Amino acid sequence: MAVARLAAVAAWVPCRSWGCAAVPFGPHRGLSALLARIPQRAPRWLPACRQKTSLSFLNRPDLPNLAYKKLKGKSPGIIFIPGYLSYMNGTKALAIEEFCKSLGHACIRFDYSGVGSSDGNSEESTLGKWRKDVLSIIDDLADGPQILVGSSLGGWLMLHAAIARPEKVVALLGVATAADTLVTKFNQLPVELKKEVEMKGVWSMPSKYSEEGVYNIQYSFIKEAEHHCLLHSPIPVNCPIRLLHGMKDDIVPWHTSMQVADRVLSTDVDVILRKHSDHRMKEKADIQLLVYTIDDLIDKLSTIVN
């Protein structure tokens, strides 16, 4: 059994308030009603104030310790699963935590092994290892039912987590869900380039989101990821699923979310496309839609329970 230990780390972060965090949508609130009630303006940010946060570590025998931050609260809890080499302090993760705080719900955000504050070597990372990281967070830190929010590659992993822990994962929210995308993009390369990557052991994938202009992805990561592809067959996930995707996404085509929606067994699936949003979905309107979709899922699950 993994053990969580707390490292008191003083940090000053801005306190935020969502202008419409507690809007009541009524007992029969659906997605169309939710979108209709989203205000046209962005959330109103209040002046920064001091707030002490704490960084914790999940100790795992024979596995790297995972850095995480956990907000205690009521169920269902929210777990944010980041994208490739992304940290737990990203825009979406922080916005979700603040939104959960305003509603009194539990929230967990974490760094994969080899990433951010977690132990491990990023060059030794694999999708399978990160899958184990997600399951460790669910098994050892999360209390009760959970809504998983997966960003990009995190959306791929949230599907795997839902398959492995159906009794605990009660809803999914994917943002630019990158199911199978890394493998698909690599397989689309010219044969000569694929051979070159195999010889070098690294694929320098161009990306405007990297400071270096490329993501240096280990060839071993790509080959191992082939064992975790999902879109070739029905995906045994039956919980409510919401998939958000920007139509200007030049990293993960928005059609990927459509494929996921088609492959999952769940009949409660909504795909929401934003015409002018890119891969990161970090604009204020994107974040607003994200947190309101979480709120809608919480309301839906509460209605089912009651």
Swiss-Prot record:
What is the protein name for this chain? Palmitoyl-protein thioesterase ABHD10, mitochondrial
Activity regulation field = Inhibited by palmostatin-B.
Q: What does the record give as the reaction this protein catalyses?
A: S-hexadecanoyl-L-cysteinyl-[protein] + H2O = L-cysteinyl-[protein] + hexadecanoate + H(+); mycophenolic acid O-acyl-beta-D-glucuronide + H2O = mycophenolate + D-glucuronate + H(+)
Source organism (scientific name) = Pongo abelii (Sumatran orangutan)
Q: What is its main location?
A: mitochondrion
User: Cross-referenced InterPro entries, in alphabetical order?
Assistant: AB_hydrolase_1 (IPR000073), AB_hydrolase_fold (IPR029058), ABHD10_acyl-thioesterase (IPR052382)
In this protein, the active site sits at S152, D249, H279
Which Cys pairs does UniProt list as disulfide-bonded? none
Recorded hits in PANTHER family, A to Z, give: MYCOPHENOLIC ACID ACYL-GLUCURONIDE ESTERASE, MITOCHONDRIAL (PTHR16138), PALMITOYL-PROTEIN THIOESTERASE ABHD10, MITOCHONDRIAL (PTHR16138:SF7)
Q: Which family does it belong to?
A: Belongs to the AB hydrolase superfamily.
Start and end residues of each AB hydrolase-1 domain: 78-177
Enzyme Commission numbers on file: 3.1.2.22, 3.1.1.93
One annotated GO biological process: protein depalmitoylation
The cellular location(s) given in this protein's UniProt record come to: Mitochondrion
Q: Which GO MF terms are attached to this record?
A: hydrolase activity, hydrolyzing O-glycosyl compounds; mycophenolic acid acyl-glucuronide esterase activity; palmitoyl-(protein) hydrolase activity
- Which residues belong to the transit peptide? 1-52
